[in-house]
Amino acid sequence: MQRSILAATALILTLTAPAPTHADPVPVGLDAYAQWDRWPQQRIGVRAYMRSTYDRDGGNRTADASHFLYAERPDFNVALDILGRGVLYFVRTNHWHGSPWHYEIDGTDNLVRETSTVDPERPVRNSTFEPATTFPPPLAWTWSTTRGADLNWVPIPFDRSLRLAYGRTFYGTGYYIYHQFAEGTPISTPLVPFDLTKPPDAKVLDLISRAGTDIAPQDIARHDTKATLTPGEPTTLFDHSAAATIRALKLTIPRDHARELSDARLRVTWDDRPSPSIDAPLALFFGAGLLHNRD
C-alpha cells in the first residue's frame, strides 16, 4: 500500500563539512549548552560516564535503591565518588529522596535541598531545589513538575574530585552523568570548582526555555519535497553534493499513520560512504517512543 506523505524512509546526503580538530576547544559547563550548534560534533578527549545506585549483585534488589558505595556517617551516604577533573551534568533522584544532598567539590561540601525535605511525609506542592537561584528551571525540575523525579542539569565542575552523598537513605535512588577529559584536551573555559552561590547564566536559561520551538535561521536555503512511501522500499528525499550544514530537518506526516510510521527507518549518508551515519527508527531520531501525540 502506498501513502503520500511529506516524509522519507531514507535520506542520502553528500556533505563535506569542516571537521573538528583536536585543537578545537571542547565546550564544557554552561558552554556545552550555549554552543548548541556544536552539539552534533564528535568531541575528542571527552569521556562520558553514567553511574547509578544499581544493585551490584545484579538482582535489582529494592528496585536499585539505596546501594551506596559507602557511608561515612548517618547523614553522608556516598553514591558517586570521582577523582580527577570533570563536569557533573545530570542528577536524577526519585522524588526528593536522599535530600539533603552533599555535593562535595574538591573537598568542599555544598548542601543542596529540596523543599519537601523538612517534612518528607507531607511533600510540598510546587517544590523547588534550594538554593532556588542556583538550581532554577529549566535546568532543574522537581517531582511536582515531572510527576516522579527530581532532575538537575546544572553543570557541576570539579578540578580534583567530586563526591555526591545522600543525607537520607530511604529509597535512595540516583542516576548520574558526568564528563571527564583526557590529559591535554583543550576546553572552552577553565574548570572553576562549582560555586553554590552563583546562578546559571540567564542566556542559557533562556535558550533551554525555548526547547521545542523553531530556532533555525529563516533566511537559509530550503529544499521541499513531497514523497510517496512504498513499504519495504527506500525513498530518497534529499541529495546534496557540495559543502553545507543541515540546520533543520522537518517532516510532516498524516496523523492517522503516525504510529506505524514511527518505525520507518531514517538513513543519512555523508560523502558517498558505504554505510549510513544515521540509521534509526523515525520516532527514535526525533527523541520519541512513538510519533503519536496523545494530546
What is the meaning of each model-derived region?
Residues 19-22:
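Sec/Tat signal peptide C-region and signal peptidase I cleavage site
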